[in-house]
Design a protein with these regions (language model features):
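Well-ordered mid-protein domain cores that form the structural environment of catalytic cofactors
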Residues: 5-62
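Short internal beta-strands
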Residues: 69-75, 96-97, 192-199
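A glycine- and small-aliphatic-rich helix-loop capping segment at beta-alpha/alpha-beta transitions
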Residues: 23-34, 59-69, 86-89, 185-191, ...
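Acidic, glycine-rich loop-and-beta core segments that form the ion-binding/anion-interacting portion
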Residues: 141-224
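Active-site nucleophile and cofactor-binding loops and adjacent substrate-binding regions
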Residues: 15-17, 43-49, 132-140, 168-174, ...
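Short glycine/serine/threonine-rich phosphate/pyrophosphate-binding segments
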Residues: 45-58, 79-80, 174-181, 204
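Active-site/ligand-binding loops adjacent to catalytic centers
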Residues: 82-139, 144, 200-292
Length: 295
């Protein structure tokens, strides 16, 4: 059997892997505003299923010229995550519970970003919207780094030699972290397969297997709430890279919005499967494997 290694990404201040991006991203925003001569206040809107909320609040709290509002689904995060967000200190932070699931919160935030009337009203108040979710490219860029860091660590430890291909298995909900691995591969990192690991909300596993994405399905609340997502927004980026067609991807996203599903062409699915494989685990399997690994 091939050796298996675990990349520890819980050493940030909130114990979420997203700390690696969200500790850097606020500093990049401040520098970007300075370089562009921007003086307006920035309002960060965040939808979270758990991890992103606290990590974003911790990164952006008390950053001058910035305010942040986080929206999470009622009962859709772990109690620890809810308390982490609710107790966040800072004069510029706000947290709101949303009736619905993560997809409802994410869709609502996206609608605000696309509402020109809201943008005009905020402009009168000298406020500009931004995002700390992975729809913001600034979230994905720092995540590319630790794929290279992991590869370098394996070389340093003598486990591989430079040029050996390494597969990465990534727990996946919104397709952001695994997409960062795809970008690392495109940049030249010797990556074999990127394995998309899903829980019972296995919409991505079905898509990567069949080529049909169906968001209209039963939603499960699981013990991995950060992966309880049915509309994976970063998949749109992958589809663009594979098809190279704005119009085709726009058509797929229109179908998703109107019918809840879409199907890609066979050659598109084949191109995706060259880089990605997938699998999912039931709640029973998850609990059993945690017990096997840690007891």
């Amino acid at each position: 059997a091939l050796p298996i290694y675990a990349l520890e990404l819980w050493h940030g201040p909130t114990c979420a892997f997203k700390d690696y991006a969200l500790q850097l991203m606020p500093k990049l925003l401040v520098e970007a505003k300075k370089n562009l001569g921007r003086t307006e206040k920035t309002l960060i809107l965040v939808a979270t299923s758990g991890d992103t909320g606290k990590a974003a609040l911790d990164g952006y709290h008390d950053i001058p010229g910035v305010e942040i509002a986080v929206f999470y689904p009622t009962g859709g995060t772990s109690e620890i995550q809810r308390l982490q967000m609710a107790t966040q200190e800072g004069a510029n932070v706000a947290v709101y519970a949303v009736r619905g699931n993560y997809d409802d919160a994410q869709t609502g935030v996206k609608k605000v970003f696309g509402d020109t009337a809201i943008a005009a009203e905020l402009a009168k108040r000298n406020i500009r919207l931004s995002s700390a979710n992975s729809i913001n490219w600034g979230r994905l860029v720092p995540q590319i780094v630790y794929y290279f860091a992991a590869y370098a660590q394996l070389i340093k430890a003598g486990r591989i030699t430079f040029g050996d291909e390494v597969d990465f298995c990534v727990p996946t909900g919104n397709f952001g972290d695994i997409l960062a691995g795809y970008y690392a591969k495109r940049m030249g990192l010797p990556v074999g397969k990127l394995v998309c690991a899903s829980n019972e909300n296995n919409v991505l596993t079905d898509f990567l297997t069949t080529g049909t994405y169906t968001a209209k399905r039963e939603f499960f609340k699981t013990t991995s709430p950060s992966m309880d997502i049915l509309v994976s927004s970063n998949l749109e980026r992958l589809l663009y890279h594979v098809t190279g067609s704005d119009a085709e991807v726009a058509g797929l996203m229109k179908s998703l919005a109107e019918t809840g599903s879409y199907t890609v062409r066979p050659e598109t699915l084949a191109a995706i499967q060259e880089n990605f494989s997938c699998g999912w685990s039931s709640e029973e399997e998850v609990v059993g494997e945690i017990g096997r690994a840690h007891v």
